[in-house]
Amino acid sequence: MIDRFGRPLEDLRITLTHACNFECFFCHMEGEEGDNYLLSKEDILLVAKVARKFGINSVKLTGGEPTLRRDLVEIVRGLKQLGYEDVSMTTNGFLLKDLAHKLKLAGLDRINISLHAVSRDTFKKITGVDAFDRVIEGIKSAIDVGLVPVKLNFVVNRRNREEAFKFIELSQNLGVNEIHLIELHPVGLGKLAFKEHDDLREIEEYIEKISIKKLIRKKHFRPRYVLPSGLIVEVVKPYANPIFCAGCNRIRLSVDGKLKTCLYREDNVIDVLDILKGEYSEDVKEELLGRAFMIAIAIREPNFKYKI
């Protein structure tokens, strides 16, 4: 499906929970501000089933922290049974050492792991948890079981910017495939923490100097730098960036049952909770959800647009 701005809809992001065992001060919560209402596994898979009918072939599980869902493995297995070619997840890695193998067997294809520091002290200051070593073990487990590409997310801010350069070195030593250096943006808790925002220009200039090739990612048109080691460094600057929005191919299912068409907005959402919890047959629910998707696609628009 193509929206009225010519952007294809290819990716479904599902927030499994708002609960998290970390307390990162800038968490964007997938742009959601509603209650932590947990959709059932059946609800999630029904929405995902309808999304497949619209040509969506990629799904990412997010949170909060998705590994806190006890039915996570079953959800992953169900998504693969629906025919999704690409099932991925973003996690803080705390529980990954014990879950990586089970998730791989269930069909998880790849994984993003958040690691916003390279030292225990900075890690604890950012997350509120002394778990740096445990997350490193989770990363190693993901690599060992073949959840590739393993990507690490590093949100750059004033509290950790000096570690961004060392983060590149650590990532190469760990053997991960790719890292994302992400600009802090004012969504979720990031609204309150935006004073900690730090410009990525100096870091990107350094990466460009040491890289052997520069690429542009089709999704969001992000710059990607290939280092001599083979590590790919992607620079993510979404805020006030029309280029980022022009390449957006996502729709989100929020934790409280809304189809969310934009990370930055709460006014253009379609509430499907009543459909999911209503006393309808599954066929009727699918039909109603299909209509909801059509409306969501119709109202979808870039938050940041080029000024003409």
UniProtKB/Swiss-Prot annotation:
In which residues is [4Fe-4S] cluster 2 bound?
Answer: 245, 248, 262
Q: What is the superkingdom listed in this entry's lineage?
A: Archaea
Q: Which InterPro entries match?
A: Aldolase_TIM, Elp3/MiaA/NifB-like_rSAM, MoaA_arc, MoaA_twitch, MoCo_biosynth_MoaA/MoaC, rSAM
Entry's EC annotation: 4.1.99.22
Gene3D superfamilies, sorted: Aldolase class I (3.20.20.70)
State where [4Fe-4S] cluster 1 binds: 20, 24, 27
Bilayer-crossing regions: none
The record's comment on cofactor binding reads: Binds 2 [4Fe-4S] clusters. Binds 1 [4Fe-4S] cluster coordinated with 3 cysteines and an exchangeable S-adenosyl-L-methionine and 1 [4Fe-4S] cluster coordinated with 3 cysteines and the GTP-derived substrate.
Q: Needs which cofactor? A: [4Fe-4S] cluster
Pathway as given in its UniProt record: Cofactor biosynthesis; molybdopterin biosynthesis
Keyword Lyase on entry: yes
Q: Which reaction equations make up its catalytic activity?
A: GTP + AH2 + S-adenosyl-L-methionine = (8S)-3',8-cyclo-7,8-dihydroguanosine 5'-triphosphate + 5'-deoxyadenosine + L-methionine + A + H(+)
Q: Where does GTP bind?
A: 13, 60, 90, 151, 250-252
Q: What class of enzyme is it?
A: lyase
Record NCBIfam families: moaA_archaeal (TIGR02668), PRK00164.2-1 (NF001199)
What task does this protein carry out?
Catalyzes the cyclization of GTP to (8S)-3',8-cyclo-7,8-dihydroguanosine 5'-triphosphate.
What is the name of the protein in this document? Probable GTP 3',8-cyclase
* Underlying gene: moaA
